[in-house]
């Protein structure tokens, strides 16, 4: 539905034998509904406005008077009008409505408020201004004579020492809050939780929302920020019905996915391999208990494990083939060698694990060259080799590992998207 929201001004509906702004917009855009916002002073115009709007030939809109009546002593306060008009626009805003705002009727403060709302908030709106018939100010200025100027000064009742100060210092609190909320929504939508946390924690924004809402958002952003600062596990994940390995892996994957969205490619490459190694290591430890032992933090094959020699031979053979030294008799891979993602893949191949799982690991390993440049050198990432499509595939490969190896339900993977929607909704 197309809805026109308009204040009723002193010149509406007809001025100097021409449409005033409200009538002209209705005539041109023919909205399905016209929502009229009256001030106390303009309420006397109700019958006149309705009759003139319905006089447009072939047009019979729904005319609705909004329940909010603007106080005469507030229509010249920008921040108040920003708050009130914002509430009115919000009331009629949804995915099915196209909103038209009249930027030419009402006090300058009402017009400015609607202009700001159109620019700042993410509403489906278009704002319309209407020029006067002569394309200039409504009241023409006639030059005064010297005597008329002198009389004007003399008759000015404010031109004395005891004049009444009618100026109002507008702090624009609501307008400022709207700007801050918009900025916070933008930061959260781009997953920049640390920047959003730094802003919302400022004391001057304690009244940005209700105490309950501001405390909730601050707690969430603090929790999210800890993940990227310290690799802490999300509070929500700690409460999920998962074991410790599943919680660690899910938390790490979600962190990688956010880094991918923020295009922190170097971090994604380094962390993706680490996560894959962790998941496969946990899988092998569970399925073949005792095969892997640790020398400090370094994983190695257990020489006492029944299949150890056969696995060593298989890995050694594949390593020699990859290096083109098949004829070398001496082993280049032994029980002293530290296991990594490639050797874990070889173990999965030895035990004939699912081919789809092996394909996913190979996909992660295919980016290992770029990963090593970042992790072990100061090389620039070749973005030609790392398109968004490849990074998306990398994320999908990691998801497959988490689902197939650790049994993590895929419904957890959109955690941050769900949280973002909730926080953004609260900041509207």
UniProtKB/Swiss-Prot annotation:
Location of the region described as CARF domain in the Swiss-Prot/TrEMBL record: 1-145
Top-level taxon: Bacteria
Keywords: Antiviral defense, Endonuclease, Hydrolase, Nuclease, Nucleotide-binding, RNA-binding
Effect seen on changing residue 107 to A: About 100-fold reduction of ssRNase activity in presence of cOA
Top EC class, one word: hydrolase
Region (HEPN domain): 146-428
GO molecular function: endonuclease activity; nucleotide binding; RNA binding
Effect of residue 129 to A: About 1000-fold reduction of ssRNase activity in presence of cOA
EC number(s) from the headed UniProt entry: 3.1.-.-
Pfam families: Cas_Csm6_CARF, Cas_Csm6_HEPN
Family statement drawn from the similarity comment of this UniProt entry: Belongs to the CRISPR-associated Csm6 family.
Other noteworthy facts: Encoded in a type III-A CRISPR locus.
Domain notes: The N-terminal CRISPR-associated Rossman fold (CARF) probably binds the cA6 effector. ssRNase activity resides in the C-terminal HEPN domain.
Protein name as catalogued: CRISPR system endoribonuclease Csm6
């Amino acid at each position: 539905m197309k809805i026109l929201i308009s204040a009723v001004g002193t010149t509406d509906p007809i001025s100097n034998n021409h449409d005033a702004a409200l009538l002209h917009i209705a005539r041109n855009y023919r909205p399905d509904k016209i929502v009229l916002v009256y001030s106390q002073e303009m309420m006397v115009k109700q019958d006149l406005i309705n009759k003139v709007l319905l006089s447009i030939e072939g047009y019979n809109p729904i005319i609705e008077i909004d329940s909010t009546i603007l106080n005469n002593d507030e229509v010249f306060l920008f921040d108040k009008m920003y708050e009130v008009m914002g509430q009115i626009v919000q009331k009629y805003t949804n995915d099915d409505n196209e909103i038209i705002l009249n930027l030419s009727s009402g006090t300058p403060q009402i017009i400015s408020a609607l202009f700001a709302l159109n620019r700042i908030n993410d509403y489906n709106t278009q704002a319309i201004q209407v020029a006067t018939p002569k394309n200039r100010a409504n009241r023409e200025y006639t030059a005064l004579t010297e005597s008329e100027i002198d009389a004007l000064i003399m008759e000015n009742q404010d031109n004395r020492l005891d004049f009444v100060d009618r100026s109002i210092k507008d702090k624009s609190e609501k307008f400022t809050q709207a700007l801050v909320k918009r900025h916070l929504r933008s930061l959260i939508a781009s997953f920049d939780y640390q920047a959003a946390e730094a802003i919302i924690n400022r004391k001057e924004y304690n009244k940005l929302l209700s105490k309950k809402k501001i405390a909730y958002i601050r707690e969430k952003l603090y929790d999210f920020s800890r993940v990227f600062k310290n690799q802490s596990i999300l509070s929500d994940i700690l409460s999920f019905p998962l074991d410790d390995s599943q919680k660690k892996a899910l938390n790490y994957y979600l962190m990688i996915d956010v880094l991918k969205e923020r295009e922190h490619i170097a971090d994604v490459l380094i962390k993706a391999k680490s996560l894959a190694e962790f998941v496969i290591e946990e899988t092998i430890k569970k399925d073949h208990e005792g095969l892997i032992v640790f020398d400090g933090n370094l994983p190695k094959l257990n020489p006492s494990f029944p299949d150890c020699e056969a696995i060593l031979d298989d890995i050694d053979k594949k390593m020699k083939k990859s290096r083109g030294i098949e004829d070398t008799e001496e082993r280049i891979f032994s029980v002293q060698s530290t296991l990594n993602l490639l050797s874990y893949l070889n173990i999965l191949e030895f035990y004939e694990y699912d081919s789809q799982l092996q394909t996913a690991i190979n996909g992660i390993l295919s980016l290992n060259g770029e990963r090593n440049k970042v992790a072990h050198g100061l090389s620039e990432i070749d973005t030609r080799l790392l398109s968004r499509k490849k990074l998306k595939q990398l994320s999908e490969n990691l998801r497959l590992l988490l689902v197939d190896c650790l049994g993590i339900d895929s419904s957890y993977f959109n955690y941050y998207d769900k949280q973002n929607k909730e926080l953004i909704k609260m900041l509207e």
